[in-house]
Amino acid sequence: MDQLHSLFTELLGLESPFHLGLIEKDLREGQISSMTFTIEIDKDYRPSRFHNIHSYYEKTWQHLSLFQYPSFIKARLPVFMDKRNGKTEVIEIPWARKGSGFTLLFEEQVLALLRLCNCKTTTANFFNIYPQRVQTIYDCYTKSLYEQRSPEVARKVGVDETSTKKGHDYITLFVNLENGQILDIQDGKSSDTIKNYAEELRILGKSIDTVEEFSLDMSPAFISGVKRNFSRARMTYDRFHVVRLIGRYFKPLYRSKKIDHELLDYHLKDFDQLWTQLNCENAAAFLCYWKDRTKELFKMNRLCKSINKHFMGIVNFVESKVTNGLLEGMNSKIQFIKRAARGYRYTENFKRMILFAFGAL
């Protein structure tokens, strides 16, 4: 029995003045239903020579399961009175936060599963607790961190918007493309979104010149915002959006019987050579050639004008190698978070859950 007490004392991380008392199994219909560990405090313990024991109180905390059995920690703890001022105080316990009915280790596992599955109901069902208690644990650990959090800056930044609810409500994510860390989340998707990010960095004394590369779609608002507020940063338009733009212009041509579809296929496939050019000079020369051939073969003046408008942002990929692929993957998870919660009434709660899900809180 001494060996068992010694083992569980070590597993529970108990140190003086706390020690392990009874270990009890709770039976239901002759079968073990749960385990309870009673923690006691040394009888002669006092915070100081000015303290006397005033009273006792009992409390139980749910702990991590022992094998397949739910386990609980129970303690009868003293309330001390300070003889100098007559005030009472309780002893601080190392295994749980104040006011919680769960141990710190239990709450840690709840948060780990919630971060993984992004659904409070699923997490609650797994641990056999009420969803509101999962919400309470989540709020306790994330609210203050979210309020204290400030925007970060990085060398390579990806920018992408995502919807917060049905309609036209959006938030914009700023992500470090080198490690996937969320740098900031701003409301909206206008040029002011980029401006607000830059201004917050300046207020915090963080140099906006740290940003060398921006990866973004061809949103005029984002392009304008980066040009005005991050003038030293190089812009690269996401490959996927560039290819999608070209495909959108070519799609109507496939409906025509007067145009050779094999020639269309070849010309579209030929565009992929752009991404393998050695440098921006070669890429610019190739894009000019491809654009001129497009105009000559298919009379696509509007596409050529669009390429001219976004020319450098397209060819910059050859050297920057940055894309928004990481953000597109994150966006899929973000939309799952929104669906799992059946929407968020308040945008700040949605932003907090995103930061939590991606490890930024």
Show where each model-derived region lies.
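Short, positively charged, Gly/Tyr-enriched micro-motifs
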Residues: 60-168, 208-209
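The DNA-recognition helices of helix-turn-helix-type DNA-binding domains
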Residues: 130, 141-145, 218, 253, ...
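Gly-rich Lys/Arg/Thr-decorated short loops/hinges at beta-loop-alpha junctions or inter-strand turns
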Residues: 91-94, 177-183
